[in-house]
Curated annotation (Swiss-Prot):
The lineage of its organism: Eukaryota, Metazoa, Chordata, Craniata, Vertebrata. GO terms for cellular component: azurophil granule membrane; chromaffin granule membrane; clathrin-sculpted gamma-aminobutyric acid transport vesicle membrane; cytosol; intracellular membrane-bounded organelle; lysosomal membrane; melanosome; membrane. The modification Phosphoserine is found at residues 8, 10, 12, 15, 151. GO terms for biological process: chaperone-mediated protein folding; exocytosis; negative regulation of neuron apoptotic process; neuron apoptotic process; regulated exocytosis; regulation of synaptic vesicle cycle; synaptic vesicle exocytosis. It comes from Homo sapiens (Human). This is DnaJ homolog subfamily C member 5. InterPro entries: DnaJ_C_subfamily_member5, DnaJ_domain, DnaJ_domain_CS, J_dom_sf. It is a lipid-anchor. Keywords: Acetylation, Cell membrane, Chaperone, Cytoplasm, Cytoplasmic vesicle, Disease variant, Lipoprotein, Membrane, Neurodegeneration, Neuronal ceroid lipofuscinosis, Palmitate, Phosphoprotein. Oligomers. Homodimer. Interacts with the chaperone complex consisting of HSC70 and SGTA. Interacts with ZDHHC13 (via ANK repeats). Interacts with ZDHHC17 (via ANK repeats). Interacts with SYT1, SYT5 and SYT7, and with SYT9, forming a complex with SNAP25.
Length: 198
């Protein structure tokens, strides 16, 4: 059993139908009927001395589980067992994306764009370094202010000078100290609402 060659992944999507003895356009009722008939025939309880029957029963169960699930059956019909493997690895919603990106024309497009942009150096320079470290940066349209960088030290100095100019009169009275009994406003009266949430 260990010397046996591993089964290769098919792309035709027909072998599960052959396991159940059906053709590719079988309905879900046909699949159920064929599964019941073959499951009774190859069930391990009915064939206790036949290990091939147990293996055949496992294949029948696998075929039934895949062909009765509408999403898995659709993937199997389009891409075969390779599609089921991809769905298991990357998720059922990503199967089409995987096969599109692994097609010859997607790979050729990727290589062509790489050659056109000097191994994507142009994209890296434009996106990461703002076109030659800002030297080739696109000009802002007329009438719009250009954004520029202000260092935190310059910003702090500007804020301090604005505060000095805005406060002409110094504050000469210290605020009163607060304690636990100090109220936030002078005209409010304390209420503890102990009489039924008024």
């Amino acid at each position: 059993m260990a010397d046996q060659r591993q089964r290769s992944l098919s792309t035709s999507g027909e072998s599960l139908y052959h396991v159940l003895g059906l053709d590719k356009n079988a309905t879900s009722d046909d699949i159920k009927k064929s599964y019941r008939k073959l499951a009774l025939k190859y069930h391990p309880d009915k064939n206790p001395d036949n290990p091939e029957a147990a293996d055949k029963f496992k294949e029948i169960n696998n075929a039934h589980a895949i062909l009765t699930d509408a999403t898995k059956r659709n993937i199997y019909d389009k891409y075969g067992s390779l599609g089921l493997y991809v769905a298991e690895q990357f998720g059922e919603e990503n199967v089409n994306t995987y096969f599109v990106l692994s097609s010859w024309w997607a790979k050729a497009l990727f290589v062509f764009c790489g050659l056109l942009t000097c191994c994507y150096c142009c994209c890296c320079l434009c996106c990461c370094f703002n076109c030659c470290c800002g030297k080739c940066k696109p000009k802002a349209p007329e009438g719009e202010e250009t954004e520029f960088y202000v260092s935190p030290e310059d910003l702090e100095a500007q804020l301090q000078s604005d505060e000095r100019e805005a406060t002409d009169t110094p504050i000469v009275i210290q605020p009163a100290s607060a304690t636990e009994t100090t109220q936030l406003t002078a005209d409010s009266h304390p209420s503890y609402h102990t009489d039924g949430f008024n």
